[in-house]
């Protein structure tokens, strides 16, 4: 399971960002070629995470993490950990283009598991990006949401970032999706959930001014 990204100019090349779908450890990222039926591991930062607390790792990646091609450049692909990463050469090298965009609260990043043994599978890594999109209208306008309830935008390809989280969105919400209207570059949609915190209300927002203000569009959900 996980995010996939199909190469815009070659549908035989597929990228998958999912720790549980392959070997490769923390941040396992695959490049699969249907012609040769070969998989190449192109992890952003190959690092053994077994038995380590997430706070002690250089970078954190969720069990499934965003992998997205730029709509403006088929040679550019993004991957989301606690930072946003970018590659211009099909994942052979990566560059961090953001600071840590999560809350990065150390008390939330310890070892998980029970009293006798700890979970060492790498599944319990939080404070990471849960969704990412580059504006189809404006090259370099990057929107990133996290699993701990923060939304950031960069309008210069990652050089500078601004927090634009809806003020009414409760803390620790899981931002599941950020989408930009196909008809208007300044209309942004956001969906979030808090069911893991025993909150089953829907959280749907729309901004009509590029993230400056947000309105709830829950309606009668």
Q: At which residue positions do the language-model features occur?
A:
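Beta-propeller blade termini and top-face loops
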Residues: 1-221
């Amino acid at each position: 399971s996980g995010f996939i990204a199909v190469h815009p100019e070659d549908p035989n090349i597929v990228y998958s960002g999912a720790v549980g779908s392959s070997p490769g450890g923390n941040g396992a990222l695959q490049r699969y070629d249907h012609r040769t039926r070969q998989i190449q591991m192109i992890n952003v930062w190959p690092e053994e995470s077994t038995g380590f607390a997430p706070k002690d790792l250089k970078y954190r990646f969720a069990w499934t993490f965003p992998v997205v091609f730029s709509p403006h450049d088929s040679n550019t692909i993004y991957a989301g950990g606690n930072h946003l990463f970018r590659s211009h050469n099909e994942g052979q090298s990566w560059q961090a283009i953001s600071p840590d965009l999560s809350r990065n609260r150390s008390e939330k990043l310890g070892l998980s598991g029970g009293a006798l043994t700890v979970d060492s599978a790498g599944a319990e890594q939080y404070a990471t990006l849960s969704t990412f999109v580059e504006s189809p209208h404006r090259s370099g306008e990057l929107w990133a949401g996290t699993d701990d309830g923060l939304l950031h935008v960069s309008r210069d390809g990652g050089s500078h970032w601004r927090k634009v989280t809806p003020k009414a969105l409760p803390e620790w919400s899981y931002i599941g999706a950020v989408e930009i209207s196909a008809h208007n570059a300044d209309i942004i949609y956001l969906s979030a959930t808090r069911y893991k915190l025993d909150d089953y209300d829907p959280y749907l927002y729309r901004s009509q001014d590029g993230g400056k203000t947000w309105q709830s569009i829950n309606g009668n959900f």
